UniProtKB/Swiss-Prot annotation:
SUPFAM superfamilies per the UniProt record, alphabetical: ABC transporter transmembrane region, P-loop containing nucleoside triphosphate hydrolases
Source organism per UniProt: Talaromyces islandicus (Penicillium islandicum)
Knockout mutant characteristics: Impairs the production of cyclochlorotine.
Keyword Secreted among UniProt keywords: no
Highest rank taxon of the organism: Eukaryota
Keyword Protein biosynthesis: no
Predominant cellular place of this UniProt entry's protein: membrane
Intracellular or extracellular location(s): Membrane
Protein name: ABC-type transporter cctS
Bilayer topology annotation: Multi-pass membrane protein
Glycosites: N176, N524, N617, N725, N992, N1085
Organism lineage: Eukaryota, Fungi, Dikarya, Ascomycota, Pezizomycotina
Domain called ABC transmembrane type-1: residue spans: 293-582, 951-1255
Keywords, alphabetical: ATP-binding, Glycoprotein, Membrane, Nucleotide-binding, Repeat, Transmembrane, Transmembrane helix, Transport, Virulence
Function: ABC-type transporter; part of the gene cluster that mediates the biosynthesis of the mycotoxin cyclochlorotine, a hepatotoxic and carcinogenic cyclic chlorinated pentapeptide. CctS is essential for the biosynthesis of cyclochlorotine, maybe as a chloride channel that supplies chloride for chlorination by cctP2.
């Protein structure tokens, strides 16, 4: 059969019979059926091949990684959907009717009927019936989903029949054929409606084992039409419009997007390269996205083609009938809708890929983190310029999750721009421009291509400047984070002004870089808006001046529209290439991390048959790694202490030959930095094994473990407790089945009952980020409780008694470490509490500098002289405590909030009152609802500038829009001139009428048109447009920088001088978020998005006004359409804002859990919880992807409706022009059609940008909120009756006089009627049980709490009459938690740079830290003061505490206050510090020490015993010891085990007196 048509394709306002019969009725339907059959066969054989490898079993968490791939990778194939059965039965009837019609035409057709086309329709209908029959039998449902085939074929048939019906009605077809065609059209209309509107339902219900998946998501069950128009989101959008969305309102995530499905599938990909693995994994999605992008690329160019035809009709109406003109107008509407649907589907497919890419990459990174080796990062010296590059730091790994995965996932949604949209649209646009402008059109496209490098260059320059901004921002955030991390140290020392100056200096650098960024952003935006004008100038120059062509209306404005369409891919390709390069770099960083060396734990501990625990001639070391030549890791909390380093070379444990006693208590002791923590980690297999062997029976597969008996796993309690941001109970139970009896026994053993009873939510209280809502002692006890509750056979404890008082330590040791819960377990206990532990342990290992100095039983080591025999003499004094003897709660360092109880109410630890508030309610980060308050917006606007500034801004926006309109009006005038001349030349009647009626001179000949004149004016207008655009942006950015600087300084001031209670109540992460993300939005996003929003808003107003002025009737339609726009935008804004906020909220748990895994990977591996944490991470990622995808679905929901309304704008504009043909001249019609064509894109950008501005204003609201927090009263609360002496305090006497205070007005007093004296130059100890109020007393001394009653005097001066700065300079407090800053030792010892090298070195020597830090001196440096860029990463906790004490001694304050400052220091060093304090007292320093180690204060001059916030006892040590057995101090001494030593020291002191 010959398919070539000799007649015209279009004849007499309809398609020719040749096209209808040969193509629409025959070739297209048969080809589609053949393609469908081939696709079905390919899918069938492919599915059969895959089915051979499917494991039909399924478990939510597989027992191994490989098994998880087999079990989950193909679950989606069991999820086949179908049209409801009722509709399928109707389908059968309709297709049988279609076949009957074909038979009827074959029998009764006339001579003019093409039988081939009728036969083709019969064959295609039979194929449709065959597909339907297979669908009904469900015989192939596991292999091929045939429902989409039916939908596509019905739609294709309906589309062809639409044109056939049009031709049959307007042509001379036979009556039977016309009727049959109309009936067929009706049948396929019903079929299409059935398939387009029918919801999809699961063929089979979910299996009970498929517990990973919940109900189908809305988009899975939505109809085809609903998916094309995103109507499946209607319920959610309406719900968001009526009320604020909550997480519970969100739809289920599509199971094909779940991490538990996509991650195992991705792991099954075979290629080595991560990039090609991603391409292979998403190949089908990329092809679908490419298909939609291709359809969109063709559809967007249909309007300018139709516009040209319409304008030609307007110029010469006789060229076509009016019905053809209306066909053009209808085509504008249809093309706009098709382009909108294709564009939305293309973007949606990209976002689906982005979500799955994020899930895949986060899973890859997360599982790698759980397998990564532990690396130690040291400062590299000048002799070693290149840092080892073997390991990523924690900060870099976190950046992989937060930054790099986002770069890659976002780029995956835009790949179509590079490989489809840009090349296809460029080719189509070039062809159309060539048809319009000839060679000049090609020149125009060539110019756009030639200017593309300029776009890329500016984009790269902007990226480079942005990188500098990020670097400066990182420095500023790091400085502010350092303040927040050490805020107590800074406030205690009155260093706010100094550290504020440091931050502001970083801020000034950041503002300078931001100024550069804004300048380049202005250049970029000016270029963005000016390049189309430049291309237009040069194209028209060649077209009119060089080649002297006539540029009429029908040529100029379609060309402008085409250039406008091409501008989008040309501008987006520049950004896409930049983002693609950035994503490629990020992908490389991720791949590099994934290729890092993993932990050797499983190889070292691979001997599963061994029952020994210990080392055999083992030498172990820490790998020394860096990442990106970064020398020092970020200051992140870790569950391990990689800090015991005697030299710049990695620390080593050398020649270990140890056999720990099974089922016994093994104690590891030694001085600070000797390697105790490292030995425990080496036992876990976390250190690199140089030679020898490590023995520790270990199973690392969670599903092989029993939950009701001891298992071959290890419970690990690091020195700095690893606490999850879960409830206290969840931290203890740690994903094991809950056993109430065992749980109660654990709480009893670790003395947590009273603490839990003090919380309103009991054990359902959230521990906070890193345990931020718990005190140090509470965190250690929760960590120990986790170990006891576990079924682990081996327990490793790292100094877990250092943060509790002696009574509590005594209770924990005998009830937990030596209690029933430890029976049958092997315990390795690294500790400094040798007096308590050694007399009762079974085996001892003495360490010094990484070597075993001695090992054996206590008796053996005493006989060898390695242990003091006095320690063993106190053995009988321990264990006298009765069960349940502890009776206090630890509140000194816990969160002081209205939710804390004042007394030990009788509360069930296992049940919480359901009417009580959510435990998170008091600590959740504020999340504003609805629109941002006007007061916040007004605050920001006022800081931008005075009234004259706003007048100037409005003027610049107005003049810029006026000039923009002038460019097109001038083109119109230019084109009109050509139109007039053309009409004059070819229409003598028109020429005579014009001359006679209008008395005008005869127009010039075409060659006499002053093209250069029009070109010159156009160039001038364009230059003015570029200038005012650039100037406007600079003016706005000037105000933005001013506002950013002012608001940030107010934020910094407000937080720095906030009350200490603010930092107790608000988690550090929330405060840091204000200084990082919110400030970034304030600095960079508000102004840029606001400019674009205001510009587009002004442009939209200008377009509507202009079109209405040319076509007044359009105003009627415009009113209704604008109302529809407003309605759609209003209901969209609420949902988009809520989804964005929910996504921000759900992002935090992902980052938090990742941080917890990063810092606790050692504990996770020890407890064999890797698979559990991976599953939890996948759930959190799904919770993040759900609002993310819904947010982008709402964007597409909006996009389709905006495009539809935009198409209506273009349709009505064209309709009114055709309808009012006589009153609208072609040039004006061309201009209004041009603006109408651009309206849809503009309104879409406006709504999206407006939503972004609303979301960004939320950050402004959050920042402004923190500028209004309650401040400390820096000025004196009372007016002094005399001037403060210059040398105050000269003596250092302290007096508490009936002092009473409380944390908040609604809480009971924490100190009540405190009265005692501290004589000048004396040393006074404050002791008491945990929770007695000791630490609160230190806060009172520096007015961290203000007096409610009574007073505190220093040298007779009421401290309320002294400014805070002066007071805190006079009184130096050393807190229990060591505060160490970034910078060298010099910067840490002397932040104000007031002391000499000699003074600092002497102070280091006094606290016994000098020898330790000398080993870190790089090269041949003579002083240790300039080494260690970040001491927190190189010093152990005890050494960091020594550094803080050295800083305190260096200040030489008259009053020194130590708040349990030596709790983490070994006894020998503690004794040395006490000797230093004695030396200080000789020069008149008053020392107040809060202590748990009573032996260290035995020679103090006075002891004050606190109990329940009151002074229970006071006097000299000897006086308190002489009291009867009911004396609190004496009982504390007995419980400490040092009573005899304390009595001896006290007697010697009293004897000296």
């Amino acid at each position: 059969m010959n398919f070539r048509c000799s007649s015209p394709l279009w004849y007499d306002d309809h398609l020719s019979d040749c096209v209808v019969n040969h193509y629409l009725s025959t070739l297209i339907p048969l080809t589609a059926c053949l393609a469908s059959a081939i696709a079905c066969l390919i899918s069938y054989f492919h599915a059969r091949q895959n089915a051979k490898h499917i494991d039909t079993g399924f478990h939510p968490v597989a027992s191994s990684e490989d098994e998880a791939v087999d079990q989950i990778a193909h679950v989606s194939q069991q999820y086949i959907t179908a049209i409801p059965p009722v509709i399928e039965k109707l389908e059968v009837a309709l297709i049988l009717a279609e076949i009957s019609i074909a038979i009827f035409l074959l029998i009764f057709s006339g001579e003019n009927t093409d039988l081939t086309s009728v036969f083709a329709s019969a064959v295609s209908s039979i194929y449709l019936l065959l597909i339907l029959f297979v669908r009904l039998t469900r015989s192939l449902q596991s292999y091929v989903d045939l429902q989409p085939h039916s939908s596509v074929l019905y739609t294709l048939q309906w589309t062809c029949l639409t044109a056939i019906v049009h031709a049959a009605i307007l042509g001379n077809s036979e009556r039977n054929f016309t009727i049959a065609t109309l009936v067929r059209f009706a049948l396929f209309t019903f079929l299409c409606l059935f398939h387009w509107t029918a919801p999809r339902i699961p063929v089979e219900p979910y299996d009970e084992d498929h517990v990973l998946f919940l109900d189908p998501s809305e988009d899975e069950t939505a109809s085809l039409l609903s998916r094309m128009t995103f109507s499946w989101l209607d319920k959610l959008v309406w719900k968001a419009y009526r009320a604020t969305l909550q997480v519970s309102d969100l739809y289920q995530l599509n199971h094909n997007h779940r991490s538990g499905v996509v991650a195992p599938r991705f792991k099954n990909t075979a290629t080595n390269s991560l990039l090609w693995r991603l391409f292979g994994f998403f190949k089908s999605d990329l092809l679908w996205q490419g298909a939609w992008a291709t359809l969109n690329s063709f559809a967007v160019f249909v309007p300018p083609v139709l516009m040209r035809s319409l304008l030609e009709y307007l110029e010469v109406p006789d060229l076509a009938s009016q019905s053809t003109a209306w066909l053009y107008v209808t085509g504008l509407l249809v093309a706009g809708i098709v382009a909108g649907v294709a564009g939305c589907q293309c973007d949606w497919k990209g976002r689906e890929m982005a979500a799955r890419t994020r899930a895949v990459l986060i899973n890859e990174i997360y599982t790698k983190v759980l397998r990564k080796g532990v690396a130690l990062h040291l400062q590299t010296n000048s002799e070693q310029p290149e840092a080892a590059d073997n390991f990523a730091s924690d900060g870099n790994i976190f950046n992989l999750l937060t930054v790099d995965t986002e770069h890659v996932s976002e780029m995956s949604g835009y790949l179509y721009l590079v490989w489809i949209t840009f090349p296809v649209q460029t080719a189509i646009g070039t062809y159309l421009l060539y048809r319009l402008l000839g060679i000049s059109g090609i020149v125009g496209v060539a110019l756009m291509l030639g200017l593309l490098p300029l776009n890329i260059l500016i984009s790269r320059r902007l990226v480079a400047v942005q990188a500098r901004v990020l670097t400066a921002s990182d420095a500023r955030i790091q400085a502010s984070s350092e303040i927040l991390n050490n805020v107590r140290t800074i406030k205690y020392s009155a260093w706010e002004a100094v550290f504020k100056k440091r931050v502001l200096s970083k801020r000034r650098i950041e503002l300078v870089e931001m100024r550069s960024r804004f300048i380049w952003w202005s250049i970029n935006m000016t270029t963005f808006f000016s390049l189309p004008l430049i291309v237009t100038i040069l194209t028209l120059f060649f077209y009119t001046v060089v080649w002297d062509n006539s540029m009429g209306t029908a040529v100029a404005f379609p060309a402008l529209v085409i250039f406008s369409i091409l501008r989008i891919p040309f501008n987006r390709i520049a950004d896409a290439i930049t983002f693609l390069l950035r994503a490629h770099v990020s992908l490389g960083r991720i791949e590099k991390f994934l290729q890092e060396q993993e932990t050797g734990k499983y190889e070292q501990l691979s001997r599963t048959d061994s029952v020994e625990v210990g080392f055999n001639n083992a030498t172990l070391t820490w790998p020394n790694g860096g990442f990106g030549n970064k020398a020092v890791t970020e200051n992140k909390r870790s569950d391990i202490q990689l800090t015991e380093l005697p030299s710049m070379r990695p620390f080593k444990l050398k020649g270990l030959n140890i056999r720990f006693q099974p089922g016994a208590l093994n104690v590891i002791c030694g001085p600070s930095g000797s390697g105790k923590s490292s030995l425990l980690l080496a036992l876990l297999g976390e250190m690199a094994l140089v030679n020898g062997q490590v023995f520790l029976p270990h199973k690392h597969n969670w599903h092989e473990l029993s939950t009701d008996s001891l298992t071959e796993t290890t419970a690990y309690c690091p020195q700095e407790a690893w606490i999850l941001n879960r409830t206290i109970r969840a931290n203890i139970v740690f994903d094991l089945p809950f056993d109430g009896r065992r749980y109660e026994a654990v709480l009893e053993a670790v003395a947590l009952r009273p603490d839990i009873a003090s919380f309103d939510q009991g054990d359902q209280t959230l521990a906070g980020e890193g345990g931020s809502r718990l005190s140090g002692g509470q965190k250690q006890r929760v960590s120990l409780a986790r170990a006891l509750y576990s079924r682990s056979k081996y327990v490793l404890l790292d100094d877990c008694l250092s943060a509790v008082d002696s009574k509590t330590a005594n209770h924990i040791f005998f009830h937990a470490v030596k209690g029933d819960l430890m029976q049958g377990r092997t315990c390795m206990f690294a500790t400094n509490s040798i007096q308590l532990t050694i007399p009762h342990c079974d085996y001892i290992v003495l360490l010094d500098d990484g070597r075993v100095r001695g090992q054996g039983t206590a008796e053996e080591l005493v006989s060898e002289g390695r242990i003091d025999a006095d320690i063993m003499q106190n053995k009988a004094e321990f264990g006298s405590e009765k069960p349940g003897a502890y009776d206090t709660i630890e509140l000194d360092h816990a969160i002081k909030s209205p939710s804390s109880r004042s007394s030990l109410d009788t509360v069930s630890l296992l049940e919480v009152d359901p009417q009580q508030e959510d435990p998170e309610a008091g600590y959740e980060e504020s999340k504003a609802e609805g629109a941002v308050a006007w007061s916040v917006i007004r605050t920001y606007l006022v800081t931008l500038g005075p009234p004259w500034y706003w007048v100037l801004v409005l003027f610049m926006f107005g003049i810029q829009q006026f000039i923009s309109l002038a460019t097109n009006i001038w083109i119109k005038e230019w084109a009109v001139r050509y139109d007039m001349l053309d009409n004059f030349a070819f229409d003598p009647i028109q020429r005579n009428a014009t001359t006679r009626d209008e008395t005008l001179d005869e127009p010039e000949e075409p060659q006499k048109v002053q093209a250069r004149y029009y070109m010159a004016i156009y160039v001038a207008i364009c230059l003015a447009y570029a200038f005012f655009t650039f100037a406007r942006d600079l003016i706005v950015f000037y105000g933005s920088l001013k506002a950013s600087s002012e608001i940030y300084e107010r934020l910094l001031n407000s937080v720095l001088f906030a009350k200490l209670l603010f930092f107790d109540r608000i988690p550090l992460g929330q405060i840091t978020n204000r200084f990082s993300r919110d400030v970034e939005v304030l600095d960079q996003n508000i102004s840029t998005f606001s400019i674009n929003t205001l510009q587009i808003a002004a442009s939209l107003v200008m377009i509507i006004v202009f079109i209405s002025s040319v076509v007044p009737a359009f105003l009627i339609a415009a009113v209704f359409i604008c109302v529809a726009y407003w309605f759609v935008m209003t209901i969209f804004i609420n949902g988009a804002r809520d989804l964005r906020r929910i996504e921000s909220v759900e992002r935090s748990p992902v980052y938090q859990q990742f941080s917890e895994a990063l810092s606790g990977c050692v504990s996770i591996r020890a407890y064999a919880r890797a698979s559990i944490f991976t599953a939890q991470n996948q759930v959190l990622v799904d919770r993040l992807n759900s609002p993310y995808l819904l947010q982008w679905a709402s964007q597409q929901w909006l996009g389709f409706r905006v495009n539809f309304l935009g198409s209506l704008i273009l349709f009505f504009t064209g309709a009114f022009v055709v309808w009012d043909l006589e009153s609208v001249d072609p040039s004006s019609a061309a201009l209004v059609l041009t603006y109408a064509a651009m309206f849809s894109e503009s309104i879409m950008w406006f709504v999206q940008l407006y939503a972004i501005v609303q979301q960004n204003l939320n950050s402004v609201e959050r920042v402004v909120e923190y500028t209004e927090i309650e401040q400390e009263a820096n000025q004196p609360l009372k007016r002094a009756v005399y001037d403060l002496p210059e040398d105050w305090p000269s003596r250092g006497g302290v007096r508490f006089d009936a002092y009473t205070t409380r944390y908040a007005p609604e809480l009971p007093p924490v100190l009540n009627d405190i009265t005692f004296n501290v004589p000048p130059g004396k040393r006074v100890a404050v002791v008491g049980r945990t929770g007695a109020g000791k630490s609160t007393l230190t806060l009172a001394l520096i007015r961290g709490l203000e007096a409610e009653l009574g007073r505190i005097e220093i040298d007779g001066i009421d401290i309320s009459e002294v400014t805070l700065d002066r007071l805190r300079q006079a009184v130096t407090v050393v807190p229990q938690d060591p505060g160490v800053f970034r910078g060298t030792l010099r910067d840490n010892l002397d932040p104000l740079h007031l002391y000499s090298n000699e003074e600092m070195i002497e102070t280091l020597r006094a606290v016994r830290l000098l020898d330790a830090v000398r080993t870190y001196i790089p090269g041949n440096s003579a002083t240790p003061l300039d080494c260690l860029d970040h001491p927190a990463n190189a010093l152990s906790r005890g050494q960091r505490q020594l550094l803080c004490i050295a800083r305190t001694l260096l200040r030489r304050s008259r009053v020194l206050v130590f708040d349990e400052a030596t709790a983490s220091i070994d006894h020998t060093t503690d004794a040395a510090i006490q000797e230093s304090l004695r030396a200080s007292v000789t020069v008149g320093t008053t020392v107040i020490t809060v202590a748990h180690r009573l032996l260290t204060i035995a020679d103090y001059d006075k002891v004050v015993v606190l109990d329940a916030g009151c002074v229970a006892e006071q006097g000299s040590v000897q006086e308190l010891l002489d009291r009867d057995d009911d004396g609190i101090f004496r009982r504390l001494c007995v419980q400490s085990g040092d009573l005899e030593k304390i009595e001896r020291v006290a007697a010697e002191k009293s004897g000296r007196k």
